[in-house]
Amino acid sequence: MPSSKPPSSQRPAAPEAPELIWLRPERTGRGPKPAHSRTSIAAAAVEIADAEGLEAVSMRRVAAALGAGTMSLYNYVPKKEHLLDLMLDAAVAEYDYAALAPTGDCRADLARLGHQQLGLCRRHPWLPALVISRPGIGPNALRYTDHFLAVTAPTGLGGGARMEAMALFNGFICQYAQYEQSAAAGAKWQTELVGYLARAAMSGEYPHLAQAFATSGPPGDPDTAFDRALDRVITAILAPPTPR
């Protein structure tokens, strides 16, 4: 009896799987009750990255940490980029929103948020690179976005302007954290950098740099320097937009 199925060339193509991990089901494939979850996989990856850096994270390493076969994890996390997105969202779940409840004082609220974010970046040194390079659209990242919009609502800025302000805010803190990491990892590099810039300032080729060096005091406490820089960023966020 001839088959009732149409030739393969006439069958509709299977729908393409969503690229975003957040649009995919928690687990694909049939079989017994899942032994793992995205949460446990992300937690294992975060632990590896905290101990050894982001470059040490691989599906093989995560599988070994969970006592699972590498290929079995692809039922939960189809590719490395998805794992990075899960790690980012797992880390930003650590915000203490009870301590960050908006008070109506935007400057104070943003300062508290900035200090929590810097603490998060210090606990997870790999996090700044992901915040800058990956879209923060997981459920925990969206909660952070919603909180930032709530904190900045009293400014009267539109939603688009406040989203731009959030990008500025996050970018500053992540880059500050990365600079801290570089300085801590290479004391010799830091000493050479200061000496190099001092010689450049004294060369006569950079008069404004020379003036800045002449009128600047010693670096001082890193946390105090962060407070000053964060306050400038917050001032920029709260400033009325320039008429165009």
Region annotations inferred by a language model:
Residues 129-131, 185, 209:
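Short, hydrophobic secondary-structure boundary micro-motifs
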Residues 40, 44, 48-81, 86:
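Helix-turn-helix
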Residues 1-35, 207-216:
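N-terminal intrinsically disordered/low-complexity leader segments
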Residues 62, 140-144:
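Hydrophobic alpha-helical segments that drive targeting, anchoring, or assembly
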Residues 2, 188-244:
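A structured, mid-to-C-terminal "fold-capping" secondary-structure block
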Residues 98-140, 160, 169:
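Hydrophobic alpha-helical connector segments
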Residues 40-47, 82-98, 109-116, 143-147:
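Alpha-helical structural segments
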